[in-house]
Regions:
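Bacterial N-terminal signal peptides that target proteins for export
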Residues: 1-7
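Short linear capping/connector segments at secondary-structure termini
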Residues: 37-39, 68-73, 102-107
Protein backbone atom coordinates (compact mmCIF):
# COMPACT_ATOMS: atom_id res chain seq x y z
CA UNK A 1 0.00 0.00 0.00
CA UNK A 2 2.82 2.42 0.87
CA UNK A 3 4.55 1.65 -2.43
CA UNK A 4 1.34 2.43 -4.33
CA UNK A 5 0.95 5.75 -2.48
CA UNK A 6 4.56 6.70 -3.22
CA UNK A 7 3.91 6.04 -6.92
CA UNK A 8 0.58 7.88 -7.06
CA UNK A 9 1.61 11.09 -5.27
CA UNK A 10 4.07 12.31 -7.95
CA UNK A 11 1.62 11.25 -10.66
CA UNK A 12 -1.19 13.27 -9.07
CA UNK A 13 1.10 16.28 -8.71
CA UNK A 14 2.02 16.04 -12.40
CA UNK A 15 -1.60 15.75 -13.50
CA UNK A 16 -2.67 18.67 -11.31
CA UNK A 17 -0.46 20.93 -13.42
CA UNK A 18 -2.13 19.88 -16.67
CA UNK A 19 -5.32 21.90 -16.26
CA UNK A 20 -5.60 25.63 -16.64
CA UNK A 21 -6.65 27.97 -13.88
CA UNK A 22 -10.12 29.44 -13.99
CA UNK A 23 -10.81 32.95 -15.21
CA UNK A 24 -10.38 35.46 -12.40
CA UNK A 25 -11.11 39.13 -12.95
CA UNK A 26 -8.11 41.33 -12.16
CA UNK A 27 -8.16 45.10 -12.63
CA UNK A 28 -4.87 46.47 -13.91
CA UNK A 29 -4.98 50.27 -14.31
CA UNK A 30 -4.44 51.30 -17.94
CA UNK A 31 -4.69 47.71 -19.19
CA UNK A 32 -8.17 46.57 -18.19
CA UNK A 33 -11.26 47.40 -20.19
CA UNK A 34 -14.16 49.07 -18.39
CA UNK A 35 -17.61 47.51 -18.29
CA UNK A 36 -20.38 50.12 -18.68
CA UNK A 37 -24.02 49.02 -18.92
CA UNK A 38 -23.06 45.65 -20.40
CA UNK A 39 -20.64 47.04 -22.98
CA UNK A 40 -16.85 47.05 -22.85
CA UNK A 41 -14.65 50.12 -23.29
CA UNK A 42 -11.08 49.38 -24.34
CA UNK A 43 -8.18 51.00 -22.53
CA UNK A 44 -7.02 53.97 -24.66
CA UNK A 45 -3.51 52.56 -25.17
CA UNK A 46 -4.63 49.02 -26.08
CA UNK A 47 -3.49 47.67 -29.47
CA UNK A 48 -5.84 48.26 -32.44
CA UNK A 49 -6.81 44.56 -32.53
CA UNK A 50 -8.04 44.82 -28.93
CA UNK A 51 -10.16 47.87 -29.78
CA UNK A 52 -11.55 45.96 -32.80
CA UNK A 53 -12.26 42.81 -30.75
CA UNK A 54 -14.11 44.82 -28.12
CA UNK A 55 -16.12 46.70 -30.78
CA UNK A 56 -17.09 43.37 -32.39
CA UNK A 57 -18.05 41.86 -29.04
CA UNK A 58 -20.15 44.93 -28.25
CA UNK A 59 -22.07 44.51 -31.54
CA UNK A 60 -23.34 41.07 -30.50
CA UNK A 61 -23.42 41.49 -26.70
CA UNK A 62 -26.92 40.86 -25.40
CA UNK A 63 -28.08 38.74 -28.33
CA UNK A 64 -29.64 35.39 -27.41
CA UNK A 65 -27.87 32.04 -27.31
CA UNK A 66 -28.74 29.46 -29.94
CA UNK A 67 -26.73 26.27 -30.41
CA UNK A 68 -25.07 26.26 -33.83
CA UNK A 69 -25.75 29.97 -34.40
CA UNK A 70 -23.17 32.47 -35.56
CA UNK A 71 -21.32 30.01 -37.74
CA UNK A 72 -21.83 31.96 -40.95
CA UNK A 73 -19.47 34.71 -42.04
CA UNK A 74 -22.03 37.51 -41.67
CA UNK A 75 -24.20 38.82 -38.87
CA UNK A 76 -26.64 36.52 -37.07
CA UNK A 77 -29.56 37.04 -34.71
CA UNK A 78 -28.13 34.69 -32.05
CA UNK A 79 -24.77 33.07 -31.24
CA UNK A 80 -23.41 30.00 -29.53
CA UNK A 81 -20.06 30.09 -27.73
CA UNK A 82 -17.82 29.31 -30.69
CA UNK A 83 -19.89 31.47 -33.05
CA UNK A 84 -19.48 34.44 -30.68
CA UNK A 85 -15.73 33.88 -30.21
CA UNK A 86 -15.26 33.43 -33.97
CA UNK A 87 -17.23 36.59 -34.75
CA UNK A 88 -15.22 38.68 -32.31
CA UNK A 89 -11.79 37.38 -33.33
CA UNK A 90 -12.56 37.38 -37.07
CA UNK A 91 -13.81 40.98 -36.95
CA UNK A 92 -10.65 41.97 -35.09
CA UNK A 93 -8.60 40.53 -37.97
CA UNK A 94 -7.18 37.77 -35.76
CA UNK A 95 -8.55 34.75 -37.64
CA UNK A 96 -10.43 33.71 -40.74
CA UNK A 97 -13.62 31.72 -40.93
CA UNK A 98 -15.42 30.12 -38.02
CA UNK A 99 -14.15 27.52 -35.54
CA UNK A 100 -15.78 25.08 -33.19
CA UNK A 101 -14.90 25.05 -29.51
CA UNK A 102 -12.78 21.98 -30.13
CA UNK A 103 -10.89 23.70 -32.97
CA UNK A 104 -10.14 26.68 -30.73
CA UNK A 105 -7.95 24.32 -28.66
CA UNK A 106 -5.35 24.78 -31.42
CA UNK A 107 -5.91 28.51 -32.04
CA UNK A 108 -2.92 30.85 -32.11
CA UNK A 109 -0.19 30.23 -29.57
CA UNK A 110 -0.22 28.30 -26.30
CA UNK A 111 -0.81 29.99 -22.97
CA UNK A 112 -2.35 33.15 -21.63
CA UNK A 113 -2.08 36.24 -23.80
CA UNK A 114 -1.09 39.73 -22.73
CA UNK A 115 -4.33 41.24 -24.09
CA UNK A 116 -6.52 38.40 -25.42
CA UNK A 117 -6.87 34.83 -24.16
CA UNK A 118 -9.08 32.09 -25.60
CA UNK A 119 -10.17 29.44 -23.07
CA UNK A 120 -11.21 26.34 -25.00
CA UNK A 121 -12.27 22.78 -24.37
CA UNK A 122 -14.38 20.30 -26.21
CA UNK A 123 -17.89 21.68 -25.86
CA UNK A 124 -17.19 25.28 -24.80
CA UNK A 125 -15.02 28.30 -25.53
CA UNK A 126 -14.86 31.79 -24.05
CA UNK A 127 -12.43 34.70 -24.30
CA UNK A 128 -10.94 37.35 -22.09
CA UNK A 129 -10.09 40.66 -23.75
CA UNK A 130 -8.23 43.38 -21.84
CA UNK A 131 -9.26 41.62 -18.63
CA UNK A 132 -13.00 41.26 -19.30
CA UNK A 133 -14.59 37.88 -19.98
CA UNK A 134 -16.68 37.49 -23.16
CA UNK A 135 -18.81 34.40 -22.75
CA UNK A 136 -22.22 32.91 -23.52
CA UNK A 137 -22.64 31.17 -20.20
CA UNK A 138 -21.69 31.20 -16.52
CA UNK A 139 -23.11 34.71 -16.21
CA UNK A 140 -26.17 36.13 -14.54
CA UNK A 141 -29.28 36.34 -16.69
CA UNK A 142 -30.11 34.60 -19.94
CA UNK A 143 -27.47 32.77 -21.97
CA UNK A 144 -25.94 34.59 -24.90
CA UNK A 145 -22.80 36.59 -25.67
CA UNK A 146 -21.98 39.17 -23.03
CA UNK A 147 -19.13 40.86 -21.19
CA UNK A 148 -18.63 40.17 -17.49
CA UNK A 149 -16.15 40.46 -14.65
CA UNK A 150 -17.61 37.40 -12.92
CA UNK A 151 -15.05 34.67 -12.20
CA UNK A 152 -15.63 31.20 -13.65
CA UNK A 153 -13.96 27.81 -13.46
CA UNK A 154 -12.16 26.56 -16.54
CA UNK A 155 -11.87 22.83 -15.85
CA UNK A 156 -10.55 21.01 -18.91
CA UNK A 157 -9.76 24.21 -20.81
CA UNK A 158 -6.55 25.12 -22.55
CA UNK A 159 -5.49 28.74 -22.83
CA UNK A 160 -4.50 30.06 -26.26
CA UNK A 161 -3.84 33.56 -27.56
CA UNK A 162 -3.30 35.40 -30.83
CA UNK A 163 0.39 35.87 -31.63
CA UNK A 164 1.71 39.10 -30.14
CA UNK A 165 -1.36 39.74 -28.03
Amino acid sequence: MLLRALFLLPLLALLAGCGCPGYTYRHVPGRTARLVDGYAEAPPDAPPQVHAAIAAGNRIAGLPYRYGAGHGLGEDSAYDCSGAASYMLRNAGLMRGVRTSREFRRFGESGEGEWITVWAKRGHVFCSVAGLRFDTGWTRGPKGPKWTTRDRPADGCVMRHPAGL
